[in-house]
Every structure is written in C-alpha cells, then in structure tokens.
C-alpha cells in the first residue's frame, strides 16, 4: 500500500507555468527580459564581450542587433540565461549593499564553486549550468544555509 500525502490547501493561487516553447510567450517576455539584461550589463560594468558570452556566445553583429532593437524575440536558451542573471542580480541586492552587490560578480571568490575565480568567469565559461549553480548558491545564502 502506498502512503497518501495530503497537503493543506493554500490560500494563494499557484502561478501559471509559462511555456517558453510558445513564440507568443517569448515575444511577450523578451522586451522586459532584454531591458533587465542591459540594466545588469550597465550595473555590473560588463564589456560587450562579457555580455555576449553571458547570452550564449552570440556574435558581435547579433549582439549589436539585439542592443539596437530590444523588442527582438529571444530564443529559449537566451531567455533562460537572462532569467538566471536577473535572479542572481536580485539575490545579490538582497544579500549585499549596492556597491558590493554590483562588484561581486567580478571579484575573485574563494568559495569551492569558484576556486579563486570570479563568478563572471564561471558563468561565461560554464553557461546555463554555471548560472544555475551561482543562483542556487546565492539563494542558499539568502535562506541561511
């Protein structure tokens, strides 16, 4: 016999899942995602090459096109990357004050995850998986783990 788990009913409605396979959903989310991304690029004082790597090694011409026309629809990979970066940015600003929160990504870090490298180096080299690891680390710090 399998145990049955009963959870109390929440008074909050669960958020609807967003289907990123849908072009309409990506078109709806992309402008605000890109606005957030370029704000982060500015706050973190990233070079174009670093920003391009965070978006998934896009070419210079593609990056310039995205920058000129931030209403372009992002593909699933890029919108996922931007989502992680926004989460990282938010977590940093919860954990630290403004100057440190924006400098943290470029600072060498002794945490085992970074091995003395900066979080930015890890994320540009490790892509989405590294972004997920950085976000998980920061979320754990926020919750006191």
Put a short name on every predicted segment.
Residues 1-145:
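Non-transmembrane "mature" sequence context
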């Amino acid at each position: 016999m399998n145990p049955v788990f009963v959870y109390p009913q929440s008074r909050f409605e669960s958020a609807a899942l967003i289907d990123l396979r849908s072009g309409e959903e990506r078109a709806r989310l992309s402008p605000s995602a890109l606005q957030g991304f370029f704000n982060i690029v500015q706050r973190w004082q990233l070079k174009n090459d670093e920003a391009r790597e965070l978006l998934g090694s896009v070419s210079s011409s593609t990056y310039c096109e995205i920058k000129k026309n931030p209403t372009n629809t992002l593909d699933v990979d890029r919108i996922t990357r931007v989502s992680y970066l926004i989460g990282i940015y938010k977590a940093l600003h919860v954990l630290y004050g403004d100057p440190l929160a924006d400098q943290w990504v470029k600072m060498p870090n002794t945490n085992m995850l970074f091995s003395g490298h900066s979080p930015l180096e890890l994320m540009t080299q490790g892509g989405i998986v590294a972004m997920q690891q950085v976000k998980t680390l920061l979320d754990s710090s926020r919750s006191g783990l």
